Amino acid sequence: SSSAASDVYKRQYLFRALERCGWYEKTDDLGKTWRQMVENHLTTCVESDTDTRSDCHAWEALLCYELPAVILGVRPAALGFQKVRIEPQVGTFREASGDVITPRGLIHAEWKRDEENALHLHYTLPDGVAYANEEV
């Protein structure tokens, strides 16, 4: 686990495994990498947690996937986003909102946890896109 956590490239696999096990909140500890990049005023992604310069490594851009698909929870449920599933992994976050660009238009999703920890989800879908969660 420490090997996977320390190797930035392997985090994509660690994040998916934690998500599938229902332990996505454990990824919060690994967010320091991206916070450090912002604090160091880097304009591209680092290769490892110990780097203080950006080398433009695509695998460190994992957050570009995590935010819309996992934190917001917006994923296609059919080819080309004909149907969409919205299932956020909230972790330790209290709220999130954002827009996801799809071939069919912009999807807006936002959620917030209340004092009782209940999740309140609001979304807008482009014309012709169905919400798939109701089928489950």
Briefly describe each language-model feature range.
Residues 1-5, 9:
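Single conserved hydrophobic/aromatic residue that forms the stacking wall/gate
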Residues 6, 18-19:
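Active-site loop and adjoining helix of the penicillin-binding protein/serine DD-peptidase-beta-lactamase fold
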Residues 14-15:
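Conserved small-residue packing positions in alpha-helical repeats and bundles
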Residues 20, 25-136:
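Non-catalytic C-terminal accessory modules of carbohydrate-active enzymes
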